[in-house]
């Protein structure tokens, strides 16, 4: 105890001496080149004058003294954050982000690549007016006074504990929360086998609700431990969680004293709380955590798992426990962190405790008298209650937390798996199983799709929305009939946001995918030929070309006319893009007439070869066609037979479109539509006309767009997206002409 007090007194005495020296000398003798741990915590003072009075000046850490209007500009705060905390959070978390970037994206390895050489020469030639020695001393003092506060925070024990927590969690995330025997080792072994699907990722990933639980817990613990330095430490958290654009109002939600998470069954709620509690105990000295659940049997495996993790990571000599009630973790300083367990049948063990974090697992199913004990902790300013639960909205007793949605209380924040905006969409659309805000992804812990939803409904009506999702009941009056399938926000985004594929072609994939849905009719009020040309941009799909072609008359040259239209669209796309595409992969639907499909493919091949020889544009040398075998033969022909893939293709396209992953190029080519209207608006009208038709007691689903309009371009685009994602390259081959 005496040694600890002496150390604190010595530290404070040193800080006073440093402050006195800076005040006396104006920090003029400070080391101008010192950098700590790769960060600019000791960034030198730059003597440049600004033509504003002192009352309108502000100190930007690691930058200098600027006009106070700069304090509200995001660019300066972002630069400050990166310069102060780059070595703490960026090393691990940027590594994760680099691994997650698709290979088609260009990787910038040189920091100077962001500036052109001419801009750098101009910047280096700028000479700033400087203050004289007297004014400079005053500005130095103001600057280093601010920087000293950051140094004081960086050297504090609480901040070091926070950085240790971030570092350890990043290592766990890289290793998918397994195979980490010693968290403080610099080498982290990868998992040899991942039980859950990894979706081609080299590291572990978090569901969005798991990241939010982590953010809520970390922000609140930071505000409690760091006290006056909490606001400065939030800059570090914005770097660590990759949320640079979060405002102070948004981050205030993470410091609220009560947060409710309503998440579907089997999504990894308790699975995530175990390493989170273990890491918090082993990183923050003296932290007190409470954990309660609805029954004793649910607490026992959590108790054992947390204890096993701590013993495996740090050794059994630092872990002590009272069977089923308390786990204690000892630090070299002599301080201890504890976690206390209690079921809703006996909450006496948590009464009178002084928790910093109180996790209430399966909160919707705990006893009412236990809720009263838990709510009593709201009166403790240093305690945050985190309710995590699934919801059975069919009963009032198991969905009382759901009634808290929409609360404007400053103490309470409610997070649901499906937001209010998209709840109606999930309720109406029988194949939707997740919120569009969650990018309609399939969670790692349980694959939820339309088949699972329909199976649950067969056992018990409304069981999917009530028990698995929680928070909605299917209205049987609207189960029959038509319903729209594309969200308004996705339609608006498709109309407004159109990236240019001509100005910057490097990030895009080298291959183009074409789907042709031929129609042999001269009636413009009936179906026409739909053509869609798409490419890939990472996980997104970009529409390069769109055609809706109607024959002038039914003649023997109809197939050649359709093939010429497709070739014209392709050559114009190649002409406006300076970089040559790799392979053009074409699928021509042959359901209506297989002979005509072969003739269309032949005409396209002939036209593309002629364009290639004429060198009118950087035409790809490889034009391949999807081939199918004819019945009873081994001969393959260049056409695509659309059979049962249509519903699957539409389901996939709907998920991608509502997730914002289908985009239209700003330089979209159309020789048939653009003469009369904007091709994107033309396509959008057909998209809004598509509806899902549900019939019969089993709610059989079909898609229709013929009512009041055409759907040819939508079908072509849907199938183009489908073949680009699901058809292997070996199914395409060139044809000889």
Curated annotation (Swiss-Prot):
One GO cellular component term noted in the UniProt record for this chain: host cell nucleus
The UniProt entry annotates the motif Walker B motif at 357-362
Pfam families on file: DNA_pack_C, DNA_pack_N
Family, according to the entry, reads as follows: Belongs to the herpesviridae TRM3 protein family.
**Which function does this protein serve?**
Component of the molecular motor that translocates viral genomic DNA in empty capsid during DNA packaging. Forms a tripartite terminase complex together with TRM1 and TRM2 in the host cytoplasm. Once the complex reaches the host nucleus, it interacts with the capsid portal vertex. This portal forms a ring in which genomic DNA is translocated into the capsid. TRM3 carries an RNase H-like nuclease activity that plays an important role for the cleavage of concatemeric viral DNA into unit length genomes.
What HAMAP family does this protein map onto?
HSV_TRM3
UniProt protein name: Tripartite terminase subunit 3
Write the lineage as a comma-separated list: Viruses, Duplodnaviria, Heunggongvirae, Peploviricota, Herviviricetes
